[in-house]
């Protein structure tokens, strides 16, 4: 009997595709969010010729849940499908409840789902001075 070759599992990918690719190119005919963005970016749209730039802004005060996973797929997936970018921005506005271990866990979970923010990792607190200025 021939030994079956073991497949290397890539976290977050099923049959070589991310959840977003499956949603947008699988059995789903259309997705209203993607359709609306395409209208805005398309000829005559208010954002014609521009790139999609989304963000996923979790608060690092606990572990992610299934609702976060859905938001990750929508935020990172929409950017991926449309050739845009997605930032990971920690909403660190409540330092009493936040912890670095949650930041690490969030990053690991996003990678497990098959996405990466590259060099676009931010904290909301990075922009506090600007927020105070504009307030």
Spell out what each predicted region is.
Residues 2-135:
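N-terminal Rossmann-like or analogous alpha/beta NTP/dinucleotide-binding catalytic cores
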């Amino acid at each position: 009997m021939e030994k079956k070759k073991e497949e290397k599992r890539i976290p977050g990918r099923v049959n070589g595709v991310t959840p977003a690719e499956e949603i947008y190119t699988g059995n789903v005919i259309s997705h209203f969010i993607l359709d609306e963005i395409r209208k805005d970016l398309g000829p005559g749209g208010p954002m014609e010729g521009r790139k999609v730039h989304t963000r996923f802004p979790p608060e690092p005060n606990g572990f992610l849940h299934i609702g976060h996973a859905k938001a990750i797929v929508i935020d990172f997936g929409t950017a991926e499908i449309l050739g845009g970018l997605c930032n990971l921005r920690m909403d660190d506005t409540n330092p009493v409840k936040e912890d670095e271990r949650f930041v690490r866990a969030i990053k690991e979970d996003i990678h497990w789902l098959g996405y990466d923010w590259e060099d676009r990792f931010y904290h909301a607190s990075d922009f506090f001075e600007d927020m105070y200025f504009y307030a």
